[in-house]
UniProtKB/Swiss-Prot annotation:
Enzyme class: oxidoreductase
Family matches, as InterPro entries: HMG-CoA_N_dom (IPR025583), HMG_CoA_Rdtase (IPR002202), HMG_CoA_Rdtase_cat_sf (IPR023074), HMG_CoA_Rdtase_CS (IPR023076), HMG_CoA_Rdtase_eu_arc (IPR004554), HMG_CoA_Rdtase_N (IPR023282), HMG_CoA_Rdtase_NAD(P)-bd_sf (IPR009023), HMG_CoA_Rdtase_sub-bd_dom_sf (IPR009029)
KW Transmembrane (keyword) present: yes
Alphabetized Pfam families for the sequence: HMG-CoA_red, HPIH, Sterol-sensing
Transmembrane portions of the chain: 242-262, 272-292, 302-322, 368-388, 397-417, 479-499, 594-614
Glycoprotein as UniProt keyword: yes
Stated name of the protein: 3-hydroxy-3-methylglutaryl coenzyme A reductase mlcD
An MF annotation (GO) of this entry: hydroxymethylglutaryl-CoA reductase (NADPH) activity
Region: Disordered, residue numbers: 647-669, 1132-1173
Induction: Expression is induced at the beginning of the stationary phase, which is consistent with the timing of compactin production. Expression is controlled by the ML-236B/compactin cluster transcription regulator mlcR.
Length: 1173
């Protein structure tokens, strides 16, 4: 319990996955915090605005109360007020003629010569005027004896340039002197110039600041006074105190820097750190307002000295802890989460990401955070109760109030900010994914659909900024939120500054500081800093006379060059001109009770309207890209019909085929219905829409061709029944590729297309069985396939998906999904994974990351091709092409270019990074633009672009260039298998496997002239994972480039695979489909990486390399032990000899001679016919 109260930096960071059961003592507190945070998160914008307005009103109230109702100036031009805070010193033969502090009654020292040492300070900002000021210019009483003393300088005297006069006078006569020097004539050289001014009715004089009437000065005057008082405070303070304060302010600013750096590590450069500072500022304002209302005396000096140390001691650790927990749980919630229902079944969590993250973070960290606040507040309360002197008692009360409000705002205001941050992160991920998919060539509608489905789970599907937001919405929201807050505060301050007081004068900021210091303790006086030289002079005189002396050193008395009318507090409204009068009159008119009520009603209506607009924004806007009308008839006329081999329309009834014998399959197909029912109601088929509504009625095909043409002209294709659509398509009236758009139902379009292909006369002999075949087509998200993955869809091909593993890769366990129809492959990979795990797991290294595209350009002569190559290889060419290429996408970045010449043909190999997308379409767009810039701006207008892909990439083909230079991700994976694991799990030995690898993978592949094929079955594993995770299967050609190496390392088997060209992506292409996306979710690499673009794709490449490592290990062990054929026979065949044809085993450990039929080598009938012609 005691350890939990310590800050986390003293206890070490705990795991996010470590769940602590809630004790009965903190369950109620946690529930309360979760309720407050949930309320704030449900309406974050309203919460932020409400608290911001409340805090703004609080400090404006502080200013107004101080301006208009604050007490009068504490300092008075009276002896009783000036002598407060003075210090008395005594010297004489009894103490060796040394100054000694004396705090007793002066009457006790009857034989002492009691002197009052006074210091008059005239500001140096008035130039020559201060030189003419002298206290002896004032009319002094005749019996008053004044001794002139040397002034005392300080290190800041050169900067302030103040004129200081020091003198001593009998203590009993000091009040008369104070009354005489309240006003001192100004005999400067500028006096004649002042007398010539006609407007001037009185002469300026040096007036004691404390003698002025309580008038409200301007902002410039307040700044000047504050600066002067700060310099005086520094001059009178001890050097050690100044050093401590400087260190305190430096530490405070370092704490601010640490806050920004910590938030930057969490993914926020400015936003969250600024919000934390804003929350703390609001807490300070609320605490200060409550403290003043409770009667706690405050002063600007006390605040300026105490706040830096409060910031350093308390810090922002609690806000950082809560932020880290919320963001971490938000990332966890993006993965599929499961909960156990009351009935024991597993159901998906419907809670939104924001609510889940905040609730879980508060459940884990909320109690500890509140405990830290409570401990800190208790310590401050104890300090206040103990009565610490020197103003610290008052500051302890203020600090306790600040921490209380800081705790309250942390779970309301700041959690609302965090909810907005999470929504901004979701919006950024959504927009970045959508842009990346659009760069990959997907339509905007498909990209939006995929990006929406990849958002975090949200049952309500309501967002703070609406459903249709652009990438510029996030910075616009931040900008206008900050601007709005600043405008509100500036208006509040401006209204306060220009609001007229009861006497008609303008407000003064100095009144606030004076009211805060109304009952504060004055700072202790340092006599030797104030009048060190004067004390030395008095000591010298007392020693010479041999008389004991007592000196009372007063605080410096400051003067200002003012008009004598300052005593009357005259209005200075004319200094502000007509504008100030107009603003003051306007603000005064608002004090009218009727007008103020109307203003309140208008404000209420504004709040209600804004609430309505916020609600409307949350509902979002419908996607305007959804099709609202059928395909243009002009496009229909130009489209190619399905029945291109026959012009006349076949009879629909004659196209029906006899139903096949029904066989049940795991997936619903048309053959699942009764055979006789299919035959009887083939023309009465009822098609169901995706929305569950009936699309067609059970009407026989009785319309004539003329009626169908008339209906077609009316653009009512979607209202026709299936048989009518088939008839129109067979006549070429409805193009097959446009069925989805025409019917507005993807599943129905796939079904109709199957019927059309089955009834096409040109291929009816082969395709007649397709309409009622076992190829499934229902219950599939065809909307994602449309315009993205496949065209002319007739169904989907289910492939078994197994999982190999688990396998430990770089210290983390994975199950590897593999889509394959080859038996033993998954089991073999699992056996290899087990052996790797027993050896400590696989270790991977990323050696390269860059997708390539190699266009071909041609010039008329070789010299121009050579010049282009030299320019492209130069720094200038590289820079120009990089700028042109990078301007086409926010994700693709050109790394390098490699060029080669063949005659007048120039081949350029662009190598780029593409984030988490595989990026071929993205690169093609960038290459095209870069080549256009090269032709138009680089002086190669005679360049002829032959093709964007000149096979110099090289894509989907074996290539030594890919093997040497790499393409996509380059991965090296290694594992060390102990000898006993090789013996017990792999049933082999280390030396046998090393020798097998040399003979098979190295020498055997070299003898075959292989390029990148120095492995046993890398393509097997790569293809299975490619298909399961939505990769391009054709790119297995180069992705399976691999060399397997084995070595006997101190008795253990060291195995590694090097794969320089794994071409994968976790965004776009087949990864947008839900089944493939689910497999990526199982690996934790779906979509784009939240913080490091491209990291998900690189991690997928590491997983593939490690899976290949497991497969290589297991297969080589089986080959070394001679178990391969036996394993395949056991897993793939029910009996050793089967009449059913079996697929070939690849690779095989043994060889069997199969007799070849005599007619197998004969040419086909078509080949014989071509030979005759």
């Amino acid at each position: 319990m005691v350890a939990s109260l310590l800050p986390s930096r003293f206890r070490g960071r705990e795991s996010m996955n470590q769940q602590h059961p809630l004790r009965s003592g903190n369950r109620a507190l946690t529930s309360t915090l979760q309720f407050l945070s949930k309320t704030a998160c449900l309406h974050p914008i309203h919460t932020v605005c409400t608290i911001a307005i409340l805090a703004s009103t609080t400090y404006v109230g502080l200013l107004k109360d101080s301006f208009f109702h604050g007490p009068a100036n504490v300092d008075k031009a009276e002896w009783g007020s000036l002598v407060e805070g003075s210090r008395s010193l005594i010297t004489g033969p009894q103490n060796g003629w040394k100054w000694q502090s004396f705090d007793g009654d002066a009457d006790v020292l009857g034989d002492f010569n009691h002197q009052a040492l006074m210091t008059l300070v005239f500001p140096g900002s008035y130039g020559v005027a201060s030189q003419a000021a002298s206290p002896f210019l004032a009319p002094l009483p005749v019996n008053l004896s004044v001794i002139d003393l040397p002034s005392t300088s300080s290190p800041l005297t050169a900067y302030s340039k103040d004129k200081v006069f020091a003198f001593s006078v009998e203590y009993s006569s000091a009040p008369e002197l104070v009354a005489a020097v309240q006003e001192i004539p100004n005999n400067s050289a500028d006096l004649k110039l002042q007398e010539t001014q006609l407007i001037e009715m009185e002469r300026q004089m040096w007036i004691m600041k404390a003698a002025r009437a309580h008038t409200k000065r301007s902002l410039a005057q307040w700044v000047h006074d504050t600066w002067t008082e700060s310099l005086d405070l520094i001059k009178s303070a001890q050097t050690l105190d100044v050093v401590v304060m400087v260190l305190g302010y430096i530490s405070m600013h370092l704490t601010f820097v640490s806050l920004f750096l910590s938030m930057k590590k969490l993914g926020s450069k400015v936003w969250l750190a600024t919000s934390v500072l804003l929350s703390s500022t609001f807490a300070f304002l609320l605490g200060l307002d409550v403290a003043i209302r409770l009667g706690v005396p405050m002063s600007m000096r006390l605040l300026s000295e105490g706040l830096p140390f409060l910031v350093v001691i308390v810090g922002f650790e609690k806000s950082i802890t809560l932020t880290r927990a919320v963001l971490s749980y938000a990332v966890q919630h993006r993965k599929p989460q499961k909960i156990q229902s009351d009935q024991g079944s597993v159901t998906a969590i419907a809670e939104s990401t924001i609510n889940y993250a905040v609730r879980s973070a508060i459940r884990e960290k909320g109690y500890n955070i509140v405990c830290h606040y409570v401990v800190e507040i208790l310590l401050l309360v104890i300090g206040a109760v103990l009565g610490i002197q020197g103003g610290l008692q008052h500051f302890c009360v203020l600090a306790a109030l600040i921490l209380f409000f800081d705790c309250l705002l942390l779970f309301t205001f700041y959690t609302a900010i965090l909810s907005i941050k999470l929504e901004v992160n979701r919006l950024k991920r959504h927009i970045n994914m959508r842009y990346a998919l659009e760069d990959e060539g997907l339509s905007q509608r498909t990209a939006e659909s995929v990006a929406t489905s990849n958002d975090a789970q949200d049952s309500a599907r309501t967002y703070l900024f609406g459903n249709d937001m652009k990438g510029s919405s996030v910075p616009k929201f931040k900008f206008w939120m900050v601007v709005g807050f600043l405008i509100v505060n500036l208006v509040n301050i401006g209204s306060t500054l220009f609001q007229a007081s009861s006497s008609g004068s303008l407000s003064s900021i100095s009144s606030w500081t004076e009211s805060l210091s109304g009952s504060a303790i004055k700072p202790p006086l340092e006599p030797f800093k104030v009048a060190g030289s004067g004390l030395d002079e008095l000591l010298f005189q007392a020693r010479g006379r041999g008389q004991s002396t007592m000196v009372t050193v007063l605080a410096p008395i400051k003067y200002e060059l003012e008009y004598p009318s300052i005593h009357r507090g005259t209005s200075q409204l004319h200094e502000y001109g007509v504008g100030g009068k107009m603003v003051g009159s306007l603000l005064t008119s608002l004090e009218d009770p009727v007008l103020s009520k109307w203003v309140f009603v208008a404000l209420a209506l504004s709040v209600a309207l804004n609430s309505y607009l916020f609600k409307a924004a949350r509902l979002g806007i419908k996607d305007p890209n959804l099709p609202s009308h059928p395909v243009d008839p002009v496009e229909l006329d130009q489209a190619e019909s399905f029945n291109a081999a026959q012009n006349q329309t076949p009879q629909i009834q004659s196209s029906l085929q006899a139903p096949q014998t029904r066989v049940f399959t795991p997936t619903t197909t048309d053959s699942d219905s009764d055979a006789s029912l299919v035959l009887i109601k083939a023309s009465l088929k009822v098609t169901k829409r995706a929305e569950g509504k009936t699309a067609t009625s059970e009407l026989p095909v009785s319309r004539t061709q003329i009626e169908l043409d008339n209906l077609l002209k009316q653009n009512t294709i979607s209202e026709l029944n299936d048989e009518d659509v088939v008839a129109l398509s067979l006549r070429g009236k409805v193009p097959g590729y446009a069925l989805e758009k025409s019917l507005k139902d993807c599943t129905r379009a796939v079904k109709v297309r199957r019927s059309i292909i089955s009834r096409t006369p040109a291929t009816a002999e082969l395709t007649s069985m397709l309409e009622h075949s076992k190829l499934p087509y229902e219950n599939y998200a065809w909307e994602r396939v449309l315009g993205a993955c496949c065209e002319n869809v007739i169904g989907y091909m289910p492939v078994p998906v197994g999982v190999a593993g688990p396998i430990v890769i770089d210290g983390k366990s994975y199950f590897i999904p593999m889509a394959t129809t080859e038996g033993v492959l998954v089991a073999s990979a699992s056996r290899g994974s087990k052996a790797i795990n027993l050896g400590g797991g696989a270790v991977t290294v990323l050696t390269g990351d860059g997708m390539t595209r190699g266009p071909c350009v041609k010039f008329d002569v070789l010299e121009r091709a050579g010049a282009a190559k030299i320019w492209l290889d130069s720094d200038v060419g590289q820079t120009v092409m990089k700028e042109a290429f990078n301007s086409t996408s926010r994700f693709a970045r050109l790394q390098s270019m490699r060029t080669t010449i063949a005659g007048t043909h120039l081949y350029i190999r662009f190598k780029t990074t593409t984030g988490d997308a595989m990026g071929m379409n993205m690169i093609s767009k960038g290459v095209e633009h870069a080549l256009n810039v090269m032709a138009t701006e680089a002086g190669f207008s005679d360049m002829n672009i032959i093709t964007l892909s000149g096979n110099y990439c090289t894509d989907k083909k074996p290539s030594a260039l890919n093997w040497i230079d790499g393409r996509g991700k380059g991965i090296v994976a290694e594992a060390i298998i102990p000898a006993n694991v090789v013996r017990d799990v792999l049933k082999s030995d280390v030396d046998s496997m090393v020798q097998l690898n040399i003979s098979k993978n190295l020498i055997g592949s070299a003898m075959a002239g292989s390029v990148g094929g120095f492995n046993a079955q890398a393509a097997n594993l790569a293809a299975a994972i490619f298909i399961a995770t939505g990769q391009d299967p054709a790119q297995v050609v180069e992705s399976a480039n691999c060399i397997t190496l084995m070595n006997n390392l101190r008795g253990s088997l060291q195995i590694s695979v090097s794969m320089p060209s794994i071409e994968v992506g976790t965004l776009g292409g087949g990864t947008i489909l839900e089944p493939q996306g689910a497999m990526l979710d199982m690996l934790g690499v779906r979509g784009s990486h939240p913080t490091t673009p491209g990291e998900n794709a690189r991690q997928l490449a590491r997983i593939i390399g490690s899976a290949v490592l497991a497969g290589e290990l297991s297969l080589c062990a089986a080959l070394a032990a001679g178990h391969l054929v036996k394993a395949h026979m056991a897993h793939n065949r029910s009996a050793p000899a089967s009449s059913a044809p079996s697929r070939s085993v690849s690779p095989s450990g043994g060889t069997r001679t199969v007799p070849v039929p005599n007619n197998a080598l004969r040419p086909s009938a078509a080949a014989t016919d071509r030979a005759r012609r």
